[in-house]
């Protein structure tokens, strides 16, 4: 049996199962597209949901002289595709790239700009693209090929238009800081004034003999943040409208247009992040009002589970009863709670209005698992759509008629399948059987999931023992942890390359373990948020308790 080497892991990528890349539902809800690599070329291929059969190749890079495609995005009418290439990372999520626009009907391709830009996004009619360059917002008209700069005050470490500052990207997950209105006549955008934010410098190694120094605005706890304002730009009138709010908020973590092109939603938040106002701004009337306020004794997690429905209702998720659940609200402030229980909704997929069915993923099978459910809004009847306990990650078609599911568990690589919306299996797209067969060459140990009880709490944990484990021997212990707010390291899901690094250590005679301390996710708001204002205290207590637990096991050398 083969032993795992570092070269296997990080040089030859032996432990990389197949996946479905670039999966996107197409507008008709009957087809989907993926991006696939063959003979060093990339193709975007259209398939049928009903049977997974190929319909046609939409794009083949061998016909064009363009770099490797990092991402692709259809325009709303699917007549054009935007390609992101030569991606250059900035912070955790942000990047700048060379973009190309491909016309599906003329089979022609054009570069958006000769320079790298950020956040290129089609207008809803696909006739314009907005993007950010050098902290300013631009619009390119694809008919006339004229590019217009719509902000002029952008300057590094001073003013940012249309892209987020470090805090919003890292702490709120907001990267693109502008939104096209549904009718394409307006762009709502953020303006960050970080002039008074203190600077941080960091050495960056780019392959040369000496590093270069990156100086950027980085507010530490208690220091001054960027001053943030939201504007709406009227394209026809070439005017910028400041969205005034009654309160002076520290943060605006999200903006989103409703289905009505005059109504823009803003989240307004205080510095402690424990009070959120849901604000509706009427751009045409230049008025706004607070629809509802949410408060929390700890803090409020920002999410993207806001979905507007045709009836002027919207779906919202909240942890206000201690667990993340689904609510339907209307613009008068009325609400109906849809889900309830001591478990969390981890993803909202949407509502099929015709059948009154809502689809969501939750922890109802335990905090380390993810399962897909359908619930009828009229009868409250609920059904689980996956039949295996483990980690299910689901992507639905437009209109929610079909879905693709990825299933894995702690010891199994993902299986990708197509289904009807009632759970009926249509096709296995990839079962990674070749990968599973190859793994039999290696002497692998099982990753065991269990819980550890202490006098303070109960924690999820996993352990990997050496392949030739002998309970009468003592083994050194390697504990891996992260344990940051809302994170989860202990999941009943495939661990990708890190899983095999742990297996390599196990083959060398180590026991590897991981414990999710208080402050981590999947177990309700109280468990996750109790570290508020005391970050590091309970996490340390719990990891020490876990280490003591392991040290008392007969087969672990407590000195190692």
Task: Describe each model-derived feature in a short phrase.
Residues 15-35, 63-81, 99, 114-132, ...:
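Conserved beta-propeller blade repeats
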Residues 34-62:
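Beta-propeller domains
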């Amino acid at each position: 049996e083969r032993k795992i080497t570092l070269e296997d892991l990080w040089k030859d990528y032996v432990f990389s199962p197949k996946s479905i890349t670039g999966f996107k539902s197409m507008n008709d809800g009957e087809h989907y597209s993926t991006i696939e690599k063959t003979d060093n070329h990339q193709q975007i291929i259209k398939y049928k949901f009903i049977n997974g059969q190929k319909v046609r190749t939409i794009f083949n890079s061998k016909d064009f002289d363009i770099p490797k495609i990092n991402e692709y995005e259809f325009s709303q009418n699917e007549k054009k595709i935007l390609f992101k290439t030569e991606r250059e990372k900035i912070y955790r999520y942000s990047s700048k790239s060379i973009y190309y626009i491909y016309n599906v009907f003329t089979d022609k391709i054009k570069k958006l700009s000769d320079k790298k830009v950020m956040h290129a996004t089609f207008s809803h009619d696909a006739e314009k693209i907005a993007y950010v360059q050098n902290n300013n917002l631009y619009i390119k008209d694809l008919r006339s090929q004229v590019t217009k700069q719509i902000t002029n005050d952008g300057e590094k470490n001073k003013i940012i238009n249309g892209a987020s500052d470090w805090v919003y990207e890292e702490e709120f997950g907001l990267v693109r800081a502008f939104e096209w209105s549904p009718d394409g006549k307006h762009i709502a955008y953020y303006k960050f004034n970080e002039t008074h934010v203190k600077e941080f410098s960091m050495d960056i190694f780019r392959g040369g003999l000496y590093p270069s120094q990156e100086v950027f605005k980085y507010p530490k706890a208690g220091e001054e943040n960027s001053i943030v304002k939201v504007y709406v730009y009227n394209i026809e009138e070439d005017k910028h409208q400041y969205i005034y709010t009654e309160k002076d908020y520290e943060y605006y973590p999200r903006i989103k247009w409703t289905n009505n092109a005059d109504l823009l939603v803003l989240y307004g938040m205080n510095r402690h992040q424990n009070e959120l106002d849901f604000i509706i701004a009427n751009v045409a009337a230049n008025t706004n009002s607070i629809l509802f306020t949410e408060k929390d004794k700890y803090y409020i997690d920002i999410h993207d589970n806001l979905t507007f429905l045709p009836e002027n209702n919207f779906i919202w998720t909240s942890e206000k009863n201690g667990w993340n659940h689904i609510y339907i609200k209307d613009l008068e402030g009325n609400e109906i709670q849809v889900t309830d229980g001591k478990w969390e909704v981890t993803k909202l997929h949407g509502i099929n209005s015709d059948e009154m069915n809502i689809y969501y993923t939750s922890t109802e099978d335990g905090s380390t698992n993810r399962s897909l459910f359908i619930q009828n809004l009229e009868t409250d009847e609920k059904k689980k759509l996956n039949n295996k306990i483990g980690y299910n990650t689901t992507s639905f078609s437009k209109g929610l008629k079909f879905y693709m599911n990825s299933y894995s568990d702690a010891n199994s690589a993902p299986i990708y399948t197509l289904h009807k919306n009632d759970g009926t299996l249509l096709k296995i797209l990839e079962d990674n059987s070749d990968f599973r067969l190859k793994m039999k060459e290696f002497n692998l140990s099982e990753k065991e999931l269990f819980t550890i009880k202490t006098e303070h709490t109960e924690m999820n944990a996993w352990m990997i023992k050496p392949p030739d484990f002998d309970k009468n021997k003592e083994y050194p212990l390697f504990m891996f942890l992260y344990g940051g707010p809302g994170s989860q390291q202990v999941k009943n899901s495939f661990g990708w390359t890190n899983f095999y690094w742990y297996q390599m250590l196990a083959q060398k005679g180590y026991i590897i373990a991981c414990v999710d301390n208080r402050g981590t996710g999947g177990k309700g708001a109280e468990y996750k948020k109790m570290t508020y204002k005391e970050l590091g205290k309970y996490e340390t207590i719990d990891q020490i308790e876990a280490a003591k637990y392991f040290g008392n096991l007969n087969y672990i050398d407590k000195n190692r």
